[in-house]
Swiss-Prot record:
It is found in: Membrane. It is a multi-pass membrane protein. It comes from the Eukaryota. Keywords: Ion transport, Iron, Iron transport, Membrane, Transmembrane, Transmembrane helix, Transport. Belongs to the major facilitator superfamily. This is Siderophore iron transporter mirC. Pfam families: MFS_1. Residues 584-593 have a biased composition (Basic and acidic residues). GO terms for biological process: cellular response to iron ion starvation; transmembrane transport. The chain crosses the membrane at residues 67-89, 129-148, 186-208, 223-245, 279-301, 311-328, 349-368, 388-410, 417-436, 446-468, 481-503, 557-574. Residues 584-607 are annotated as: Disordered. CDD domains: MFS_ARN_like. InterPro entries: MFS, MFS_dom, MFS_trans_sf.
Length: 607
């Protein structure tokens, strides 16, 4: 089956997308849709949200040419976002140096992780409520505003707030790209197509720093940020036109019927939007995650530490919000269309997949981000370029592994075996890290462990997402994808916060313990500035004390990473081993096998 074929079974109520079929109305009726007496207008049952109705109607109108154009645009957008990500890594140091204030940046990075976690569900809701085209436009707008604000920022506070806008826009694009791929592809092809946004990284990881150097030599870091506010919208144009033109085509064919509530007044529209987007649920989720995780990084730098009234108050309020969240989200009266489709977690496959993503990414933030780069420079003595390449090895190898496993899934029609295999390799790589990430280890040993962990991550990530999507109905495909990606980002946010707390608590204490007496007063400066730590020659008592402090702290993080991966293999075995070529996306109860496209009631084959 070709990767892009309009007649392919897609994620939705429509089993086949044939725009020229004469009996279109009859086919749609058999698929559970309601038609006018003349058979011309098609609407879904009232429970299906407007954005889902739009994309299902658009799916009928796709031609091979328009679908190829849409996917080319997805690739262009992914290439742009990947390239800018690699470019601004080199620009951020110059930007923060221009403000002569670095203390706020570490906290902003944690807030970015929180934004990445909480923005996916509301963006998925916007896609379901208003439409895919509208949601893409919102993400692009937020993204562009973030970059304009960064380019024009005159102080670190403005720069920090701009980073939050940027995080919201970029992570919104991430979820929407995956939702679009799920909308327009069959399960067998989805694993391969879902990798499309990741493929540019194989190239951009090497050329991004070069572009940053050219920008800095010929212009300024401000233009390095501002130019993406022009480039990204341009890359979105082909997809925007494809979605907009096919949506208009569907309206001309009378496949999208306006509902009566669309003609109601402003108050009714606001009330419906409040419930559709679950505004209060979003506020609870954001407050819970932010107020619990951010204090973990602030406590070490606060005067009274964990005894500070502000730290305690934030954590208490965050915990209260976290306790209230499931009650709110499961109340049909308060949240008739909840932000988090927690009932999806009643399905074993979805629950296991989301938990697996959480622990997998938590372990990543213990072992690779955010302190491996500093560790390699200080303890291993690597230069900037070498440390950067070793750190980037994980993403490079995981992308290659994900591409390989996507091809295997397409031809073996199974996914769970690769999840379990990926978990085993991932855990093995972390164990080898604990054994070989030592002072004096050879570059081959350090690099080899990164390659193994990257292979494991690539093998398990794509199949797990596929399994979670396969367990959901089309009305909930965006919600299921958002739940999976949110679980992953939540794991990353928790991992980043805990690793930050471990690092900030242990390094200063160990420096005060191991540094020669005459250098103990330098402990704060050594901890606060990487350049200060690197200024001492290898082999001197001071550098040996610094290296020992870094090494012992890194060992603690690696032990935490191993502990975080203990549930991975059992969770992988809890996921249903769907036979992907025998199923379509329809799941009505706990682990019910989605039905295939051959007829109602026919079960997918599972083992």
């Amino acid at each position: 089956m070709p990767l892009l074929e309009p007649s392919a079974t897609a994620y939705g109520t429509f089993g086949d997308m044939r725009p020229d079929t004469e009996d279109e109305g009859e086919r749609l009726l058999t698929d559970g849709y309601v038609s006018d007496d003349d058979g011309s207008a098609v609407t879904s049952v009232d429970s299906v949200q407007e954005g889902v109705r739009k994309i299902e109607a658009i799916n009928i109108t796709w031609t091979t040419r328009s679908l190829v154009i849409a996917y080319i645009s997805i690739f262009l957008m992914a290439f742009c976002t990947s390239l800018e990500g690699q470019t601004i890594m080199s620009l951020s140091a110059y930007a923060t140096s221009a403000f002569s204030k670095h203390s706020l940046i570490s906290t902003v990075l944690v807030v970015q992780n929180v934004v990445n976690a909480v923005i996916k569900p509301p963006m998925a809701k916007i896609a379901d409520v208003f439409g895919r085209f509208e949601a893409f436009c919102v993400s692009i707008l937020i993204y562009v505003l973030g970059y304009i604000q960064m380019a024009a920022s005159t102080n670190v506070q403005t720069y920090a707030s701009a980073q939050i806008f940027y995080a919201a826009g970029s992570t919104g694009l991430q979820i929407l790209q995956q939702v679009f791929i799920a909308d327009s592809s069959s399960l067998l092809n989805r694993a391969l197509l879902a990798l499309l946004p990741e493929l540019p990284f194989l190239v951009t990881v090497w050329i991004g720093p070069t572009i940053a150097d050219v920008v800095l030599e010929n212009s300024s870091w401000r233009w390095g940020y501002g130019m993406w506010s022009i480039i990204l919208p341009a890359s979105f144009l082909p997809l925007a036109l494809s979605l907009l033109l096919n949506q208009r085509k569907a309206k001309r064919l009378n496949l999208i019927k306006e509902r009566p509530h669309h003609r109601r007044g402003f108050v009714a529209a606001v009330r419906r939007t409040w419930y559709d987007l679950d505004i209060f649920g979003l506020a609870l989720l954001s407050a819970a995650v932010t107020l619990i995780l951010v204090p973990l990084t602030l406590a070490a730098n606060t005067k009274n530490g964990w005894k500070s009234n502000s730290i305690v108050a934030m954590i208490v309020i965050g915990v209260v919000c976290l306790i209230l969240l499931p009650f709110w989200e499961t109340s049909k009266k308060l949240a008739p269309k909840p932000l988090l489709s927690l009932h999806l977690l009643k399905q074993r496959t979805a629950l296991a997949g989301c938990c697996l993503a959480f622990f997998y990414f938590m372990a990543f933030y213990f072992s690779v981000q955010p302190y491996l780069y500093s560790y390699l420079q200080v303890v291993q003595g690597y230069d900037v370029a070498t440390a950067g390449r070793v750190t980037q090895t994980f993403a490079f190898t995981s992308t290659i592994a994900a591409f390989g496993v996507s091809i295997l899934i397409k031809y073996t029609r199974r996914y769970r075996v690769y999840v379990t295999l990926g978990c085993v390799i991932y855990m093995t790589g972390l164990l080898l890290m604990l054994l070989y990430r030592k002072e004096g280890s050879s570059p081959l040993q350090v690099l080899g462990t990164q390659v193994i962990v990257g292979m494991g991550g690539g093998l398990l990530n794509v199949p797990v997402q596929l399994g979670v999507q396969a367990s959901a109905s089309h009305q909930e495909v965006a919600a299921a994808t958002a739940m999976f990606l949110t679980s992953m980002e939540m794991g990353g946010a928790v991992g980043a916060a805990i690793s930050g707390a471990v690092w900030t608590h242990n390094i200063p204490r160990k420096l005060n313990l191991y540094l020669p007496d005459e250098y103990k007063s330098e402990a704060g400066a050594i901890f606060g500035k990487l350049t200060k730590a690197l200024s001492y020659e290898m082999g001197t008592p001071v550098r040996s004390a610094i290296n020992r402090s870094y090494q012992e702290t890194m060992n603690k993080l690696l032990v935490l990473a191993l502990l975080a991966t203990l549930p991975l293999i059992p969770l992988s075995l809890l996921m249903s081993n769907y036979k992907l070529d025998k199923m379509s996306e329809s799941s009505d109860h706990d682990d019910a096998s989605p039905r295939n496209g051959l007829g109602p009631g026919e079960r997918a084959k599972r083992t």
